[in-house]
């Protein structure tokens, strides 16, 4: 499910798995391939950038642009206003906190956040019923989803 507006360079370089969901104002610069696994969720204003430009102004001003692919594993939630930079691989079962700038690979089962984005801790079975700030899913809801 894509909540408009949605922006991309080409669209032909974007591959999504089952149950993909992005909130409004997603921006994917797909000059290189972008791959999302199954059950990925993107918050509002998430930007996925495969495109880059040279550092030196003489080279940059020539119009040269390059692209590096981005891979996002299964069961990933990328929080609102986050940016994923060229060449990054985000593992499976990962949560990226809101307002993060992901410049390096993030391993499976990680909770990561910040600018630059860093792993805060691993996600474990102890987290199965946790919500925001260690609140737990109440029993009535757990009976339905658990």
Predicted feature locations:
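Flexible, glycine/small-residue-enriched loop-and-beta-strand segment within the central core
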Residues: 4-16, 21-89, 115-116, 122-124, ...
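Acidic/histidine-enriched, glycine/proline-rich intrinsically disordered or flexible terminal extensions
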Residues: 130-146
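Short beta-to-alpha loop/turn elements within the nucleotide-binding domains of ABC transporters
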Residues: 88, 99-100, 106, 115
């Amino acid at each position: 499910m894509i909540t408009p507006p949605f922006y991309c360079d080409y669209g032909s370089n974007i591959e999504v798995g089952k149950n993909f969901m992005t909130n409004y104002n997603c921006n994917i610069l797909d000059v290189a391939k972008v791959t999302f696994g199954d059950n990925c969720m993107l918050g509002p204003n998430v930007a996925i950038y495969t495109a880059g430009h040279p550092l030196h102004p003489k080279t940059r001003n020539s119009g040269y642009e390059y692209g590096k692919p981005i891979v996002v594993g299964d069961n990933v939630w990328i929080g609102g206003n986050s940016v994923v930079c060229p060449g990054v691989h985000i593992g499976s079962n990962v949560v990226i906190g809101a307002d993060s700038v992901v410049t390096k690979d993030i391993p499976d089962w990680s909770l990561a956040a910040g600018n630059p984005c860093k792993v805060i801790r691993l996600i474990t079975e102890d987290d199965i019923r946790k919500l925001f700030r260690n609140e737990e899913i109440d029993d009535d809801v757990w009976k339905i989803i658990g």
